[in-house]
Regions:
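Acidic, serine/threonine-rich low-complexity disordered tracts
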Residues: 3-97, 138-220
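Hydrophobic, well-structured mid-protein blocks that either form specific transmembrane helices
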Residues: 85-127
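Alpha-helix C-terminal capping segments
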Residues: 103-107, 133-134, 176-180
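Short, structured interface segments that constitute the first stable element of a domain
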Residues: 41, 110-148
């Protein structure tokens, strides 16, 4: 790979959501990602929902938003919100106000968590940070971030496992495979897709899910 000079640009992408079981893989629904860039700021959204035919088996909707600034070529997160429903019950519903310069995060404006540094990243914007850092440091093998979620702020390592060719819809894509074992997360980023994920594998408890890219539209 010859990596270009890093630049963040607006894009939208659709992924197919699969559940992997002992009986095989089931296509449950879709997940949409959208990055909006304007005036040295970004808004990164994701939305997921299951198909009507699978609602009886796994009725799930989720919406995430990550908002931040770009200053001196650095991504500075300010705000994160998630709303997730399983059936009629809210399984996740909280917001995080991030104060990097003061090195703390406010959870639902009720609890303040202190961070060890100003490098605070939420569960959605971490993909933007990985895209940026891999391009700027192509020989580095481990990237560490302070990931904040409802459990607090924890340092997590993302290991660059090397190049991997994967097949999506009969198209071979050259990717970089990244593993975050503490998050039980593995994903592949692609140069052709601005170093954003084309495949994401996530394990939650005993459930194993994957997101596989269906389409990607970049705006310049």
């Amino acid at each position: 790979y010859t990596f270009p000079v890093y630049s963040l640009s607006s894009y939208s992408a659709t992924y197919n959501l699969y559940s992997h079981t002992n009986l095989g893989s089931i296509k449950l629904g879709i997940v949409n990602y959208e990055l909006i860039m304007a005036n040295q700021a970004y808004v990164f959204n994701s939305s997921a929902k299951t198909n009507l035919m699978w609602k009886a088996l796994y009725d799930f909707t989720a919406n995430e938003t990550s908002i931040g600034l770009i200053k001196d070529n650095q991504l500075i997160g300010n705000y994160y919100k998630i709303n997730e429903k399983k059936g009629e019950s809210l399984s996740e519903n909280y917001e995080l106000s991030i104060y990097p310069e003061e090195k703390y995060v406010s959870f639902n404006n009720e609890i303040n968590w202190k961070a060890n540094s100003n490098n605070i990243v939420d569960a959605l914007s971490v993909y933007l940070h990985i895209s940026k850092d891999v391009q700027e440091n192509p020989n580095k093998k481990v990237f560490s971030y302070q990931i904040v979620d409802k459990k607090g702020i924890n340092s997590r390592d993302f290991f660059i496992e090397g190049f991997e060719t994967i097949n999506i819809e009969n198209n071979e894509i050259e990717t970089i495979r990244i593993n975050a074992p503490e998050l039980r997360l593995i994903f592949n980023i692609s140069k052709e897709h601005n170093f954003m994920p084309v495949n994401i594998e996530k394990t939650n408890g005993k459930s194993h899910f994957s997101l596989v890219l269906e389409n990607f539209n970049q705006q310049f």
